[in-house]
Amino acid sequence: FNLGSPKGFIFDELYYVDGAQDFLNFGVEVTGANPEFIAHPPLGKWLIAAGIAIFGDNEFGWRFATAVFGTLLILLIARLVHVLFYSPVLTALAAGLMAVDGLLLVHSRTALLDLFLTFFTLLGIYLWSRNRHWWAGFAFGLALGCKWSAIYFLAIIVLITLYRILVTHDIRETPRKIALVVTRYGLLPLTVYTLTWLGWFFSDRGWDRQSSSNPIIALINYHEEILSFHVGLTEKHPYQSHPLGWLVMLRPTSFFYDAPSGCGNAECAREVLAIGTPFLWWIGTIAIFFVVYRWIKSLRSRTTDNAANFVVIGLVAGYLPWFALPDRTMFTFYAIIIQPFLVVAIVYCAKLMLESRLNPLLSQSIVVGVFILIFICFLYFLPLFTGQLITYDQWQNRMWFSSWI
């Protein structure tokens, strides 16, 4: 709805839309007649370019792809929750919680790369859990083609798969099984990832393309520069935030702010604030701690809790790695990769509540009441998720903490 608003670029759309436009025109990103250094793989920008090719070089075209993938992500999580719990009620609850999260809504309305990363990563995990290993490897290759941070999820999946092979298979079968893992989760993702660079291979204008007569060596040279950039990214930004505050939305990222007229008041405001629906994330944070407790308990009792395993995978691969880079410039909107796992944690707790010894009507009322509370919170913050024009007082009332300004 009204995907073309706000007009013009918001936040980092400038970089990714510009890259998508270059892909359509040249196959690579350039600045004038010169190659342009870009710090992320090309697939996400190719997806943005697809929207531009279909709907034109305008705000709707820029954001169409992320809107589609945001919708698909809701369906994917609903499917995953169905597989985990086999409950229509919990499946609907998961879809509902995804749909009323402000961070997902903002990402779905902004031409950034993180939503593509999140979708393909979750798709890879889902396919892996269903033993569709070739397709899972393909999905992880696509995730890497959007952002490198998918590598943490791929690494966790590989480690878990190898562990299962070592403890459950005949020693004579182990070498063959390990070779399959290397092929499916090593060579295949690497091949898919490399194919996302086809525009760079077929052009002589890409960054570092002329650094070697061997295009593979040239691409490796380019990747060394990308790695150096990410490791050394310490430039200060007014909205940067430490990962410790991400789950509770301590310092959300303002994507857009304007103070136009036309709200019927002397002072007006429009903002797109990349913040998760507060009650959803605060409740979800508590749920995550509880799920981790249940996961540790399952380890001690040597039982399998697939839903808890899923949440822990998300924390270990999507959250903890950021703590290893304390000086790097980071933002709360990166937490979109954690959001599906947070939703599953809430659904996990809802399942336990519904199966508890409490009166069924009481337990159902608690679950429904929590969802209604989150939904009301979502509606209250909706103007900040979509950049609607409101009075300055209305905007100020939604700044519950000074760190949100």
Question: Which sequence ranges carry the predicted segments?
Answer:
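Transmembrane-helix motifs of polytopic, lipid-linked glycan transferases
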Residues: 60, 64-85, 123, 290-294
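Membrane-interface transmembrane helices that cradle and orient dolichyl/undecaprenyl
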Residues: 83-85, 124-135, 162-169
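Transmembrane helical bundles and short interhelical boundary loops of multi-pass, membrane-embedded
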Residues: 159, 165-166, 171, 176-185, ...
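Specific aromatic-rich, kink-prone transmembrane helix
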Residues: 76, 116-135, 139-140, 342-345
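Short helix- or helix-capping micro-motifs
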Residues: 94-99, 106, 126, 140, ...
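Transmembrane-helix signature of polytopic, membrane-embedded enzymes
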Residues: 68, 77-100, 133-135
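Extracytosolic helix-loop segments that constitute the early lumenal/periplasmic catalytic or substrate-binding loops
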Residues: 2-4, 8, 13-46, 50-53, ...
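Short acidic/glycine- and proline-prone juxtamembrane loop motifs at membrane-interface regions
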Residues: 10, 66, 103-114, 149
